Amino acid sequence: MVVQIRIGQGMDVHAFEEGDHVTLAGIKIPHTHGLKAHSDGDVVLHALSDALLGALALGDIGQHFPDTDVQFKGADSRVLLKHVYQLILDRGYALNNADITVACERPKLAKYNLEMRQSIADVLDVDVTQISVKATTTEKLGFTGRQEGILATATVLVSYQAK
């Protein structure tokens, strides 16, 4: 029996390093630092990829794109997300919606909200109304509060598409 509806949850964290922008949801956002990572460090797309993989128990982003593999050095996370979503589609499932939260003190993300949502929708070929991106702070608590990095979480609902 095919389970008709599946939920997945993912998260990702990256520390700040020298740089002049962060890439979130495929969008380059000016900032006083970059994100330390093997790929482009896009915590939004990494969390979303993990949520999609988790929904169908397909492992995690580290298993599919190990940071020890040189072919993923500096990889564009939009390409990785597209590959992950194709795994979902190949199994007969499709995204109902994604709900993503980004936690950081800086940069402020409100003015990039629609652009980030549209970027994700474009990669997945879904309507922008299926994608939610919210930004919050941790009230100066923890590593994000000390402006040492960024955290993102994602929850997805996927459903089996009868043929």
Curated annotation (Swiss-Prot):
> Would the keyword Lyase be found if you checked this record's keyword annotation?
yes
| Keyword NADP recorded | no
Q: Which UniProt keywords apply?
A: Isoprene biosynthesis, Lyase, Metal-binding
**The reaction(s) this protein catalyses:** 4-CDP-2-C-methyl-D-erythritol 2-phosphate = 2-C-methyl-D-erythritol 2,4-cyclic diphosphate + CMP
InterPro entries, per this entry?
MECDP_synthase, MECDP_synthase_CS, MECDP_synthase_sf
Entries under NCBIfam families matching the protein: ispF
From the Swiss-Prot or TrEMBL record, give the protein name: 2-C-methyl-D-erythritol 2,4-cyclodiphosphate synthase
Q: What is the lineage of its organism?
A: Bacteria, Pseudomonadati, Pseudomonadota, Gammaproteobacteria, Moraxellales
